[in-house]
C-alpha cells in the first residue's frame, strides 16, 4: 500500500518480478520513494527504470523531466525528450515538451520544427502555436538593432515577424483570455509589418494588459 512505506519496500522485489503488474508496481515504488527525502535517489532510479521499460508511459517521462528542469539540467532534459519522441513518435505530449524545452533553451529554429511536428499530429495543444510564434518573434528581435542599417537583415527580420503572425493569431483565437501571452507579440508583429488596422485593434488590447 502507498500509505505504508515499509510494507511496499519489503515486497518490492516480488512485485517487480510479477510481469503483468510490473507497471503498477513501478508507479507504486516511485510514489513511495517520493514521500521521503532519504529515498529521493531511489525515486529517480525507479523513474529511470520505468521510462526505460515503458517509454510511452507519460507517468515516468513527466516526472523525470520535472526533476531535470528543477535542477537546471536542460541538456539531460533534452536527451530525455529525444528518447521519448524516438520511442513514441505519435505522442503529442512528448513533442510538445520538446518544443517547449527548445524554446526555453533559445534554440529557436529547432523549437519551431518541434512545434510544427506536434501540430502535424494534432492542434489540441494550443501552446504549440505560441511556441512557434514566439520563436519567430525572438529571432526577429535579435536582428532589430542591426537591421536598422542593414537591408538584408531587415528583410530577414520582417520575414520572421511575418512567419510569427499566423501562429500567434491562431493562438489568440484558441486562447482569447491569454492576453498576457499573445498581446505583446502581436503588438510588435503588427507594428513592424505596418498592419495598420490590426495594430490599432491590438493597441487597445495591450493598453489593458501592460
What annotation goes with each model-predicted range?
Residues 29, 63-64, 97-98, 132, ...:
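Structural register within alpha-helical repeat arrays
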Residues 13-17, 48-52, 82-87, 113-120, ...:
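Conserved structural position within tetratricopeptide repeats
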Residues 2, 33-34, 68, 102, ...:
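Residue at a conserved register position within TPR or TPR-like alpha-solenoid repeats
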Residues 137-167:
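Short coil/linker segments at helix-helix boundaries
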Residues 20-21, 54-56, 89-90, 123-124, ...:
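Short coil turns that delineate tetratricopeptide repeat
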Amino acid at each position: 500500500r502507498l500509505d505504508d512505506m515499509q510494507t511496499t519496500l519489503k515486497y518490492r522485489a516480488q512485485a517487480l518480478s510479477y510481469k503483468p503488474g510490473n507497471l503498477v508496481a513501478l508507479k507504486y515504488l516511485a510514489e513511495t520513494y517520493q514521500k521521503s527525502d532519504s529515498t529521493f535517489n531511489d525515486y529517480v532510479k525507479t523513474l529511470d527504470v520505468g521510462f526505460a521499460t515503458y517509454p510511452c508511459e507519460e507517468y515516468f517521462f513527466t516526472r523525470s523531466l520535472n526533476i531535470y528542469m528543477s535542477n537546471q539540467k536542460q541538456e539531460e532534459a533534452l536527451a530525455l525528450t529525444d528518447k521519448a519522441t524516438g520511442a513514441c513518435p505519435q505522442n503529442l505530449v512528448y513533442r510538445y515538451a520538446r518544443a517547449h524545452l527548445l524554446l526555453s533553451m533559445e534554440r529557436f529554429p529547432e523549437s519551431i520544427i518541434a512545434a510544427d511536428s506536434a501540430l502535424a499530429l494534432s492542434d489540441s495543444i494550443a501552446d504549440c502555436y505560441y511556441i512557434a510564434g514566439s520563436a519567430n518573434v525572438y529571432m526577429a528581435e535579435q536582428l532589430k538593432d542591426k537591421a536598422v542599417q542593414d537591408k538584408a537583415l531587415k528583410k530577414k527580420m520582417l520575414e520572421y515577424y511575418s512567419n510569427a503572425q499566423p501562429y500567434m493569431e491562431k493562438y489568440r483565437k484558441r486562447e482569447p483570455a491569454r492576453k498576457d501571452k499573445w498581446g505583446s507579440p502581436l503588438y510588435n508583429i503588427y507594428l513592424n509589418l505596418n498592419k495598420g488596422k490590426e495594430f490599432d485593434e491590438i493597441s487597445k488590447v495591450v493598453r489593458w494588459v501592460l
